[in-house]
Amino acid sequence: MVFMPPRHGKSELCSIRFPAWYLARHQQNQVIACSYSESLAYTFSYAVRETIASNHFQNLWKIDLDTAGAIRWQLSNKENRRASYIAAGIGGGITGEGADLLIIDDPIKNHEQADSQIYRESTYNWYKTTARTRLQPDGAIIIIQTRWHVDDLAGKLLKDAEIN
């Protein structure tokens, strides 16, 4: 888990640069990236695609963007291995998909959402019953967020870890 205040670069590093590097290094793996809104998740998806398509990146790794789109896209390479990237909002459609890497960036938008017990519970339940169940064996989860509330998703997961 990565916790920092807003505007400190956590999304740039963890939701854009890292997934591009990860897909280049693990060209058969699947990434699912979620955020509080579909719009933000799609923005990250587009930025990852642009990073991979950049000349600098292509000088390091020759990877072709096999399919285009903000919601779902794939990479292909000489070995014919396919990596994929799926973007969704919290509570969005990831059922039926698998993830070697699950990125949850800013599951809570602001103080207003954080102060809503209903929203916090909904996010936690989505994580337990949907998001976490998409993880492949030996997969990894990265949660990036500003801590708006002691009982937010990260707070609940930290409490769960203490109990277990």
What are these regions (language model features)?
Residues 7-8, 38, 92-93, 108-109, ...:
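Short, solvent-exposed loop/turn segments at secondary-structure junctions
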Residues 12-15, 42-46, 152-158:
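A short acidic (Asp/Glu
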Residues 27-29, 83, 98-99, 136-139, ...:
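Short glycine-/polar-rich loops that comprise or flank the Walker A/P-loop
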Residues 112-164:
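Non-catalytic, compositionally simple segments
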